[in-house]
């Protein structure tokens, strides 16, 4: 069981550290509001991580093979990512004032993180691969206890990363110039728009 738990920790860190939509939104909000909004985005994303993990481990991910499920979910994902991308470009053009905008950033940061994570069906592809990896670790079909240990290890690593990522973004906010903030906002906006385009391309 220890080997399963440690493997899940490593896979979880690999999943969370890779840049993507959640990190981009964490950076955008954290540069304005600091640690709390950045942390809330990360914590919100745990909802989606947990849902996709359970779907992947239980085999319910097969539902995404149906066009009636996959297409609306992908369209919603693309639309939301595009909207966030436009917000990022807007912030690059006219950076928000931290004192005025921090409260607004904090209020909906948790929901933004959850929405990004829940609306991204590509997460289940990763979990399909992890399911195969888990089967290799246990040398067969994992039982319920083994799956739960793997899930717990993954979620623990995700929770640890939430605080590490938020602290990093807050440090960047305090120790970098406004020019760097604007470049970061623009980069996040372009990345989010690119991810929206990739989502549509997969239809």
UniProtKB/Swiss-Prot annotation:
InterPro entries for this protein: LeuE-type
GO BP: amino acid transport
Subcellular locations according to the entry: Cell membrane
Transmembrane segments: 3-23, 46-66, 69-89, 123-143, 149-169
UniProt KW keywords: Cell membrane, Membrane, Transmembrane, Transmembrane helix
Membrane disposition: Multi-pass membrane protein
Molecular functions per Gene Ontology: amino acid transmembrane transporter activity
Any one GO CC term of the record: plasma membrane
Family (UniProt): Belongs to the Rht family.
Name assigned to this protein: Chemotactic transduction protein ChpE
Species whose genome carries this gene: Pseudomonas aeruginosa (strain ATCC 15692 / DSM 22644 / CIP 104116 / JCM 14847 / LMG 12228 / 1C / PRS 101 / PAO1)
Name of the coding gene: chpE
């Amino acid at each position: 069981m220890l080997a399963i738990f440690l493997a899940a920790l490593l896979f979880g860190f690999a999943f969370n550290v890779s840049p993507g939509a959640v990190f981009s939104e964490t950076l955008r909000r954290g540069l304005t509001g600091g640690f709390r909004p950045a942390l809330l985005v990360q914590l919100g994303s745990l909802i989606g991580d947990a849902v996709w993990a359970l779907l992947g481990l239980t085999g319910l991910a097969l539902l995404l093979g149906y066009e009636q499920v996959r297409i609306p979910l992908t369209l919603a994902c693309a639309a939301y990512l595009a909207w966030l991308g436009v917000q990022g470009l807007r912030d690059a053009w006219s950076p928000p004032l931290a004192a005025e905008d921090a409260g607004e950033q904090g209020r909906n940061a948790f929901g933004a993180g959850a929405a990004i994570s829940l609306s991204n069906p590509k997460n289940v592809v990763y979990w399909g691969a992890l399911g195969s990896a888990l089967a290799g670790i246990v040398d067969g079909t994992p039982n319920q206890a083994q799956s739960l240990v793997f899930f717990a290890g993954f979620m623990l690593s995700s929770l640890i990363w939430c605080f590490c990522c938020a602290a990093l973004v807050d440090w960047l906010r305090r120790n970098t110039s406004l020019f760097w903030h604007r470049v970061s906002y623009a980069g996040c906006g372009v990345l989010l728009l690119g991810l929206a385009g990739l989502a549509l391309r997969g239809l």
